[in-house]
């Protein structure tokens, strides 16, 4: 693979702030030469590739030593970008990493754009678009299962599936072309209407099966959106804090203290649960609280799971009954809190599968996690170890468009259209799938995607 010609770029690859180590990364033809200008140690042009080399970063203008470093020297093409890469490992800190970055830029490097290292890896054929996107998914993964799914995508699980499907579609199109251009070739099977119907059904089944993983993939990537609802002061925020095992929401005895929607994540069996602590849903004249209530209602409508909290020490109120009614069609778990107090709630008016808890005394909180696991994981088989899951909205949209093109082929077949006239829609399916891997993606899309990456990646 011949890499494209680019100027040499540089960026800080570690988070800005104090830390044990900071890394300034360079990529491009002049990486070694630029690093050598500011490095006092071994001659980098002579060191073996993929080695760490001890020395100091020195300002060539005044010979001031900036830091004691280890330099990682990696020669193309066996690097992430398939270009020469230098990684300067410094002591962590904002000042020292910035000083070294500015030195590299002064000596000939250019400040990298967000995601430019990964973009070069894509443009140089090191990764395709799905693998590049997987890099960001790994960075943003909140649990081990989300990370594992992203790692599989980085390893090419989705790419291989899409590429194999595209190849089968291309073979079908080639067969049609041969039938049209060389009808005298008896050794090539004729693409009959029936055979085209079978091929189309095969492609549809494969893409539909992949699309059906989108819900699971979304959960792995974004978490189970979980709204904690209940009238004011029944213990919603205390439950949130208990699940998180830290204080993040405001907990007081004053009704209405949660005036907004608070979002936090908790790890349930390796899958992120996005907990949304809502303001108590009640009528109020307080404008700020009204906004929180409206957001709570919206969160309830959009939630994958609803945790409805009721107060066991009080009879059911009209608000409780309203919440039971509006959440009955949701994926819901009803929680009876404050069971350490005298029970006054009417159990005969509640669902039979309630969970009795005491947030104050941390009683039966583990049963909530068990019920969530049953609802989403055990019953639904949510996460299979070796499966490939669609988790990217762009991929999902393109698979849906590809299926629409295949449905157009089917409609044409039902109408009795000749096979050769259906090539347009079949070709469109092939092109759409190419947008997923980047083989047929427009430059504007590629630029937009990589602009979402962080600097230094």
From Swiss-Prot:
GO cellular component: cytosol
Cofactor: record remark: Binds 1 potassium ion per subunit.
UniProt binding sites for (6S)-5-formyl-5,6,7,8-tetrahydrofolate: 25, 87, 126, 457
Enzyme class: hydrolase
Presence of keyword Hydrolase: yes
UniProt keyword terms in alphabetical order: Cytoplasm, GTP-binding, Hydrolase, Magnesium, Metal-binding, Nucleotide-binding, Potassium, tRNA processing
Family annotation (Gene3D superfamilies): P-loop containing nucleotide triphosphate hydrolases, Probable tRNA modification gtpase trme, domain 1, tRNA modification GTPase MnmE domain 2
GO biological process: tRNA methylation; tRNA wobble uridine modification
Residues that, per the record, bind Mg(2+): 237, 258
Pfam families in alphabetical order: MMR_HSR1, MnmE_helical, TrmE_N
GO molecular function list: GTP binding; GTPase activity; metal ion binding
Residues binding GTP, per UniProt: 233-238, 252-258, 277-280
SUPFAM superfamilies documented for this protein: P-loop containing nucleoside triphosphate hydrolases, TrmE connector domain
Cofactor(s) it depends on: K(+)
EC number annotated for this UniProt entry: 3.6.-.-
Localization of this protein: Cytoplasm
Domain (TrmE-type G): residue spans on this chain: 223-377
Stored InterPro entries: G_TrmE (IPR031168), GTP-bd (IPR006073), GTP-bd_TrmE_N (IPR018948), GTPase_MnmE (IPR004520), MnmE_dom2 (IPR027368), MnmE_helical (IPR025867), P-loop_NTPase (IPR027417), Small_GTP-bd (IPR005225)
UniProt main location, coarse: cytoplasm
Role description: Exhibits a very high intrinsic GTPase hydrolysis rate. Involved in the addition of a carboxymethylaminomethyl (cmnm) group at the wobble position (U34) of certain tRNAs, forming tRNA-cmnm(5)s(2)U34.
Protein family membership: Belongs to the TRAFAC class TrmE-Era-EngA-EngB-Septin-like GTPase superfamily. TrmE GTPase family.
PANTHER family: TRNA MODIFICATION GTPASE GTPBP3, TRNA MODIFICATION GTPASE GTPBP3, MITOCHONDRIAL
Subunit structure: Homodimer. Heterotetramer of two MnmE and two MnmG subunits.
Stated name of the protein: tRNA modification GTPase MnmE
Organism in which the protein naturally occurs: Streptococcus gordonii (strain Challis / ATCC 35105 / BCRC 15272 / CH1 / DL1 / V288)
Lineage of producing organism: Bacteria, Bacillati, Bacillota, Bacilli, Lactobacillales
């Amino acid at each position: 693979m011949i890499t494209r010609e680019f100027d040499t770029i540089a960026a800080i690859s570690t988070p800005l702030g104090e830390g044990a180590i900071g890394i300034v990364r360079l990529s491009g033809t002049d990486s070694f030469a630029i690093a050598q200008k500011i490095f006092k140690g071994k001659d980098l042009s002579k060191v073996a590739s993929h080695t760490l080399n001890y020395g100091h970063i020195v300002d060539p203008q005044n010979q001031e030593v900036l830091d004691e470093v280890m330099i990682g020297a990696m020669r193309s093409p066996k690097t992430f970008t398939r270009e020469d890469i230098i990684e300067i490992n410094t002591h962590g800190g904002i000042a020292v990493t910035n000083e070294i970055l500015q030195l590299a830029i002064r000596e000939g490097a250019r400040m990298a754009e967000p995601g430019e290292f990964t973009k070069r890896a894509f443009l140089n054929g090191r990764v395709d678009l799905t693998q590049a996107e997987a890099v960001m998914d790994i960075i943003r993964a909140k649990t081990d299962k989300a990370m594992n799914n992203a790692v599989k995508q980085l390893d090419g699980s989705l790419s291989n599936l899409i590429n194999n499907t595209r190849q089968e579609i291309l073979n079908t199109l080639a067969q049609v072309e041969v039938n049209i251009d060389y009808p005298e070739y008896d050794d090539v099977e004729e693409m009959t209407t029936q055979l085209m119907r079978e091929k189309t059904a095969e492609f549809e089944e494969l893409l539909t099966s992949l699309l059906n993983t989108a819900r699971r993939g979304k959960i792995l990537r974004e978490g189970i959106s979980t709204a904690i609802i209940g009238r004011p002061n029944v213990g919603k925020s205390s439950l949130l804090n208990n699940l998180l095992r830290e204080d993040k929401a405001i907990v007081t005895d004053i009704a209405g203290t949660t005036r907004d929607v608070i979002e936090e994540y908790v790890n349930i069996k390796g899958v992120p649960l996005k907990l949304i602590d809502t303001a108590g849903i009640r009528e109020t004249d307080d404008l700020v609280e009204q906004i929180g209530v409206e957001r709570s209602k919206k969160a309830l409508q959009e939630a994958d799971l609803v945790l409805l909290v009721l107060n066991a020490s009080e009879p059911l109120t009209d608000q409780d009954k309203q919440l039971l009614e509006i959440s009955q069609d949701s994926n819901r778990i009803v929680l009876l809190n404050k069971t350490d107090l005298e029970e006054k709630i009417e159990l005969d008016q509640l669902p039979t599968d309630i969970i009795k808890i005491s947030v104050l005394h941390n009683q039966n909180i583990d049963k909530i996690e068990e019920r969530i696991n049953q609802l989403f994981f055990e019953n639904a088989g949510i996460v299979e170890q070796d499966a490939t899951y669609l988790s990217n909205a762009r991929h999902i949209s393109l698979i849906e468009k590809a299926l629409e093109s295949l449905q157009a082929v089917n409609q044409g077949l039902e109408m009795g259209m000749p096979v050769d006239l259906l090539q347009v829609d079949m070709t469109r399916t092939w092109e759409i799938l190419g947008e997923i891997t980047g083989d047929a993606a427009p430059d504007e899309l590629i630029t937009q995607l990589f602009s979402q990456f962080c600097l230094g990646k």
